[in-house]
């Protein structure tokens, strides 16, 4: 009789240990560790299960990576376009805020307020671009070292900034960034139209900001303004004029 009780206790202990191990495994999987169980059904992406048999794939199941023409190489195009745009937007965030603080001259208050608007708009789109990059399965790199090394944009001068200097600087800077983003739209529009649409929105706002700076100096038939009034009687040079 004692042997029977002992056997029951041992068996019960083994069963309890197995259950606890199973629970720990389930908890580990729930904490973000990928499951290696090949029988786990693939997420429902609206495509046949034959296209989603690799449960160990590092790519997420979303529109950017399950399009018929897409895959690892096309994902790289989207990530590169988004990361480069993010880096440039972050550089512009820093530069617009630097100019917002330090602009001087006749138009200092107008530019002070305008640059704050630009800073807020650029910050909003920087966040959208970073989150889109996460949506397609890559991390976003917003570190200061990355901004300095990879933005490939001229640095804004330190110290006080003359209003004419600020206008010229951002007219060129926005033009450069807008042209780069326009190129990226073409690079990704077929394989990742959602990313392309977002980049078009960014391009639109950057072109708007470029116009708002350029308009301070732009000639019209009735006003041949070239910046004399804010540049000590000398024209402010702009390309194409």
Swiss-Prot record:
GO terms for molecular function: ferric iron binding; oxidoreductase activity. Residues 33-57, 220-229 have a biased composition (Polar residues). One of its GO terms (biological process) is intracellular iron ion homeostasis. It comes from the Bacteria. GO terms for cellular component: cytoplasm. Its EC number is 1.16.-.-. Residues 25-65, 220-241 are annotated as: Disordered. This is DNA protection during starvation protein 2. The lineage of its organism: Bacteria, Thermotogati, Deinococcota, Deinococci, Deinococcales.
């Amino acid at each position: 009789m004692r042997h029977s009780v002992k056997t029951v206790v041992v068996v019960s202990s083994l069963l309890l240990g197995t259950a606890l191990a199973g629970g720990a495994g389930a908890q580990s999987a729930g904490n973000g560790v990928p499951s290696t169980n090949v029988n786990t059904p693939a997420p429902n992406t609206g495509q046949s299960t034959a296209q989603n048999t690799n449960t160990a794939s590092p790519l997420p199941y979303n529109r950017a990576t399950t399009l018929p023409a897409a895959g690892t190489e096309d994902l790289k195009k989207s990530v590169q376009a988004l990361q480069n745009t993010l880096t440039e937007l972050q550089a512009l965030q820093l530069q617009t805020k630097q100019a917002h603080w330090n602009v001087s001259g006749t138009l200092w208050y107008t530019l002070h307020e305008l640059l704050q608007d630009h800073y807020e708009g650029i910050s909003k789109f920087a966040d959208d671009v970073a989150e889109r990059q996460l949506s397609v399965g890559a991390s976003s790199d917003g570190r200061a070292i990355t901004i300095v090394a990879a933005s490939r944009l001229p640095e804004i001068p330190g110290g006080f900034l003359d209003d004419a200097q600020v206008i010229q600087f951002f007219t060129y800077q926005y033009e450069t960034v807008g042209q780069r983003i326009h190129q990226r739209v073409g690079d990704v529009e077929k394989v990742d139209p959602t990313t392309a649409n977002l980049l078009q929105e960014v391009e639109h706002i950057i072109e708007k900001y470029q116009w708002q700076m350029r308009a301070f100096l732009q000639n019209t038939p009735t006003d041949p303004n070239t910046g004399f009034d804010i540049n000590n009687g000398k024209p402010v040079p702009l390309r194409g004029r």
